[in-house]
A protein has these predicted regions:
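Extended, low-complexity, intrinsically disordered C-terminal regulatory tails
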Residues: 38-70
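N-terminal start-of-chain detector that recognizes signal peptides
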Residues: 25-26, 53-59, 89-94
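Solvent-exposed, flexible loop/coil residues
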Residues: 9, 14, 62, 67, ...
Length: 134
């Protein structure tokens, strides 16, 4: 299987770089990120047939709590289980519909503000919950 995603994509943060916030995951988060890529992101990329632009992946506690990130205290980004992304030429609503049709395992797929799509994978709980945050 050829992977179209790298760990560095899931670790990159413009806010982290600008404000010098460390974003180094522990081994468990790295393991979760690999599971997210192999079981969810890569199969979805192949199903959609277009590049997915990761806008947020893993977040350290400090990065997640930064006012410009404003992440939820229980965010799955903290454990390496989630990624936010966009796909050129597709709306988040269209992406969510494709995710639902794909049969790919996921815990949550969220259309966030009609700007980006959040997807998470948890090897023990892939309930396929779909949400819309206006």
């Amino acid at each position: 299987m050829q992977l179209n995603f790298t760990m560095s994509e899931l670790l990159h943060s413009d806010i982290g770089e600008k404000y010098n916030i460390s974003n180094i995951p522990d081994k468990k988060a790295l393991d979760n990120m690999l599971l997210l890529i192999v079981n969810c992101l890569q199969p979805l990329r192949e199903y959609i047939g277009k590049p997915m632009i990761i806008t947020s992946g893993y977040r350290s506690t400090r990065l997640n709590g930064h006012p410009l990130v404003n992440g939820a205290p229980n965010s799955e980004h903290l454990t390496g289980c989630a990624a936010d992304f966009t796909v050129k030429g597709l709306t988040p609503k269209q992406i969510v519909e494709l995710v639902k049709k794909s049969g790919i395992p996921f815990r949550q797929c969220i259309n966030e503000h009609n700007i980006w799509t959040h997807i998470s994978y948890n090897k023990d709980d892939n309930r396929k919950q779909v949400l819309f945050i206006p």
